[in-house]
Protein backbone atom coordinates (compact mmCIF):
# COMPACT_ATOMS: atom_id res chain seq x y z
CA UNK A 1 0.00 0.00 0.00
CA UNK A 2 3.03 2.29 0.10
CA UNK A 3 2.51 3.23 3.75
CA UNK A 4 5.77 3.48 5.76
CA UNK A 5 5.94 0.96 8.59
CA UNK A 6 7.80 1.96 11.73
CA UNK A 7 8.90 -0.62 14.33
CA UNK A 8 8.45 0.81 17.84
CA UNK A 9 11.37 -0.33 19.98
CA UNK A 10 14.34 0.96 21.90
CA UNK A 11 17.83 0.71 20.45
CA UNK A 12 21.27 0.77 22.00
CA UNK A 13 22.98 4.00 21.03
CA UNK A 14 26.41 2.32 21.33
CA UNK A 15 25.82 0.73 17.91
CA UNK A 16 25.27 4.03 16.10
CA UNK A 17 27.92 5.38 13.69
CA UNK A 18 28.19 8.68 15.60
CA UNK A 19 29.25 6.72 18.68
CA UNK A 20 31.70 4.75 16.56
CA UNK A 21 33.17 8.04 15.37
CA UNK A 22 33.42 9.42 18.90
CA UNK A 23 34.96 6.33 20.50
CA UNK A 24 37.46 5.76 17.69
CA UNK A 25 38.50 9.42 17.89
CA UNK A 26 39.05 9.13 21.64
CA UNK A 27 40.94 5.86 21.20
CA UNK A 28 43.34 7.47 18.73
CA UNK A 29 43.88 10.46 21.02
CA UNK A 30 44.47 8.21 24.02
CA UNK A 31 46.31 5.29 22.46
CA UNK A 32 47.74 6.41 19.13
CA UNK A 33 46.91 5.82 15.47
CA UNK A 34 45.90 2.18 15.69
CA UNK A 35 44.76 0.62 12.43
CA UNK A 36 41.32 -0.45 13.59
CA UNK A 37 40.52 2.86 15.28
CA UNK A 38 41.62 4.97 12.31
CA UNK A 39 39.57 2.90 9.87
CA UNK A 40 36.53 2.97 12.15
CA UNK A 41 36.82 6.75 12.27
CA UNK A 42 37.10 6.97 8.49
CA UNK A 43 34.20 4.57 7.87
CA UNK A 44 31.87 6.22 10.38
CA UNK A 45 30.54 8.39 7.57
CA UNK A 46 31.31 11.69 9.30
CA UNK A 47 34.59 12.65 7.62
CA UNK A 48 33.05 13.29 4.23
CA UNK A 49 34.93 10.56 2.35
CA UNK A 50 32.98 8.68 -0.30
CA UNK A 51 32.81 4.91 0.12
CA UNK A 52 35.17 4.32 -2.78
CA UNK A 53 37.65 6.75 -1.22
CA UNK A 54 37.40 4.96 2.11
CA UNK A 55 38.03 1.60 0.47
CA UNK A 56 40.90 2.85 -1.68
CA UNK A 57 42.59 4.52 1.29
CA UNK A 58 42.15 1.38 3.39
CA UNK A 59 43.75 -0.76 0.67
CA UNK A 60 46.67 1.66 0.39
CA UNK A 61 47.44 1.84 4.11
CA UNK A 62 47.15 -1.93 4.43
CA UNK A 63 49.45 -2.57 1.48
CA UNK A 64 52.16 -0.23 2.75
CA UNK A 65 51.54 -0.89 6.46
CA UNK A 66 50.74 2.72 7.34
CA UNK A 67 50.24 2.89 11.09
CA UNK A 68 51.09 5.00 14.09
CA UNK A 69 52.96 8.24 13.39
CA UNK A 70 53.28 7.34 9.69
CA UNK A 71 49.82 8.88 9.31
CA UNK A 72 51.35 12.26 10.14
CA UNK A 73 53.94 12.03 7.35
CA UNK A 74 53.24 12.47 3.62
CA UNK A 75 52.64 9.17 1.85
CA UNK A 76 55.38 8.56 -0.72
CA UNK A 77 55.14 4.93 -1.83
CA UNK A 78 53.30 4.00 -5.01
CA UNK A 79 54.40 0.50 -5.96
CA UNK A 80 53.00 -0.87 -9.21
CA UNK A 81 49.35 -0.22 -8.44
CA UNK A 82 49.22 3.53 -7.97
CA UNK A 83 49.94 6.68 -9.96
CA UNK A 84 51.22 10.05 -8.80
CA UNK A 85 47.64 11.30 -9.05
CA UNK A 86 46.49 8.49 -6.74
CA UNK A 87 49.23 9.37 -4.28
CA UNK A 88 48.25 13.03 -4.26
CA UNK A 89 44.65 12.11 -3.56
CA UNK A 90 45.62 9.73 -0.75
CA UNK A 91 47.66 12.50 0.84
CA UNK A 92 44.71 14.88 0.62
CA UNK A 93 42.56 12.30 2.40
CA UNK A 94 45.32 11.64 4.94
CA UNK A 95 45.52 15.35 5.76
CA UNK A 96 41.75 15.50 6.12
CA UNK A 97 41.75 12.62 8.61
CA UNK A 98 44.76 13.80 10.59
CA UNK A 99 43.45 17.36 10.80
CA UNK A 100 40.29 16.17 12.54
CA UNK A 101 42.23 14.01 14.99
CA UNK A 102 44.86 16.59 15.86
CA UNK A 103 42.34 19.41 16.24
CA UNK A 104 40.45 17.27 18.73
CA UNK A 105 43.69 16.35 20.48
CA UNK A 106 44.57 20.03 20.87
CA UNK A 107 41.16 20.69 22.38
CA UNK A 108 41.42 17.85 24.91
CA UNK A 109 45.10 17.24 25.56
CA UNK A 110 45.85 20.47 27.38
CA UNK A 111 43.44 19.59 30.19
CA UNK A 112 43.80 17.19 33.10
CA UNK A 113 40.41 16.70 34.73
CA UNK A 114 37.46 14.80 33.30
CA UNK A 115 35.30 17.91 33.32
CA UNK A 116 37.84 19.99 31.45
CA UNK A 117 38.46 17.26 28.89
CA UNK A 118 34.74 16.80 28.28
CA UNK A 119 34.28 20.54 27.80
CA UNK A 120 37.19 20.55 25.36
CA UNK A 121 35.73 17.56 23.52
CA UNK A 122 32.33 19.22 23.33
CA UNK A 123 33.95 22.38 22.00
CA UNK A 124 35.63 20.40 19.24
CA UNK A 125 32.46 18.52 18.28
CA UNK A 126 30.11 21.50 18.46
CA UNK A 127 32.29 24.34 17.17
CA UNK A 128 35.18 22.90 15.14
CA UNK A 129 33.58 19.81 13.64
CA UNK A 130 29.96 21.03 13.54
CA UNK A 131 28.82 17.57 14.55
CA UNK A 132 25.18 18.55 15.07
CA UNK A 133 24.95 19.75 11.46
CA UNK A 134 26.59 16.56 10.22
CA UNK A 135 24.16 14.45 12.23
CA UNK A 136 21.20 16.39 10.81
CA UNK A 137 22.54 15.83 7.29
CA UNK A 138 22.90 12.10 7.92
CA UNK A 139 19.36 11.88 9.33
CA UNK A 140 17.98 13.73 6.31
CA UNK A 141 19.84 11.42 3.94
CA UNK A 142 18.54 8.35 5.76
CA UNK A 143 14.98 9.68 5.69
CA UNK A 144 15.15 10.43 1.97
CA UNK A 145 16.44 6.90 1.38
CA UNK A 146 13.48 5.45 3.28
CA UNK A 147 15.40 4.40 6.41
CA UNK A 148 12.93 6.01 8.78
CA UNK A 149 13.97 4.21 11.96
CA UNK A 150 17.64 4.92 11.28
CA UNK A 151 16.85 8.58 10.63
CA UNK A 152 14.91 8.85 13.89
CA UNK A 153 17.77 7.23 15.79
CA UNK A 154 20.35 9.50 14.20
CA UNK A 155 18.28 12.60 14.97
CA UNK A 156 18.42 11.83 18.69
CA UNK A 157 22.05 10.73 18.92
CA UNK A 158 23.52 14.19 19.58
CA UNK A 159 21.27 14.83 22.57
CA UNK A 160 22.14 11.42 23.99
CA UNK A 161 25.86 12.15 23.73
CA UNK A 162 25.39 15.55 25.37
CA UNK A 163 23.52 13.91 28.27
CA UNK A 164 26.43 11.54 28.82
CA UNK A 165 28.87 14.44 28.76
CA UNK A 166 26.78 16.26 31.37
CA UNK A 167 26.67 13.18 33.59
CA UNK A 168 30.45 12.77 33.42
CA UNK A 169 31.02 16.41 34.34
CA UNK A 170 28.58 16.15 37.26
CA UNK A 171 29.86 12.85 38.68
CA UNK A 172 33.62 12.76 38.06
CA UNK A 173 34.31 16.22 36.69
CA UNK A 174 37.05 17.01 39.23
CA UNK A 175 38.95 13.73 38.77
CA UNK A 176 42.17 13.66 36.76
CA UNK A 177 41.88 11.35 33.76
CA UNK A 178 44.20 10.18 31.02
CA UNK A 179 42.99 10.22 27.44
CA UNK A 180 42.60 6.44 27.54
CA UNK A 181 40.53 6.61 30.72
CA UNK A 182 38.34 9.29 29.18
CA UNK A 183 37.46 6.98 26.31
CA UNK A 184 36.63 4.18 28.74
CA UNK A 185 34.29 6.32 30.82
CA UNK A 186 32.53 7.74 27.76
CA UNK A 187 32.08 4.24 26.34
CA UNK A 188 30.74 2.92 29.65
CA UNK A 189 28.17 5.69 29.78
CA UNK A 190 27.03 5.27 26.19
CA UNK A 191 26.80 1.49 26.57
CA UNK A 192 23.92 1.98 28.99
CA UNK A 193 21.98 4.44 26.86
CA UNK A 194 18.98 3.51 24.74
CA UNK A 195 17.04 5.58 22.25
CA UNK A 196 13.25 5.38 22.20
CA UNK A 197 12.55 6.03 18.55
CA UNK A 198 9.86 8.48 17.46
CA UNK A 199 8.83 8.26 13.77
CA UNK A 200 10.14 11.14 11.67
CA UNK A 201 7.35 10.58 9.14
CA UNK A 202 3.92 11.49 10.57
CA UNK A 203 2.25 9.14 8.06
CA UNK A 204 4.10 6.08 9.37
CA UNK A 205 2.14 3.14 10.75
CA UNK A 206 3.49 2.35 14.23
CA UNK A 207 4.07 -1.33 15.05
CA UNK A 208 4.79 -1.97 18.73
CA UNK A 209 4.11 -4.21 21.71
CA UNK A 210 1.90 -4.07 24.79
CA UNK A 211 4.94 -3.07 26.85
CA UNK A 212 5.25 0.24 24.99
Model-predicted segments: where are they?
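Polyanion-engaging groove/track-forming segments
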Residues: 1-212
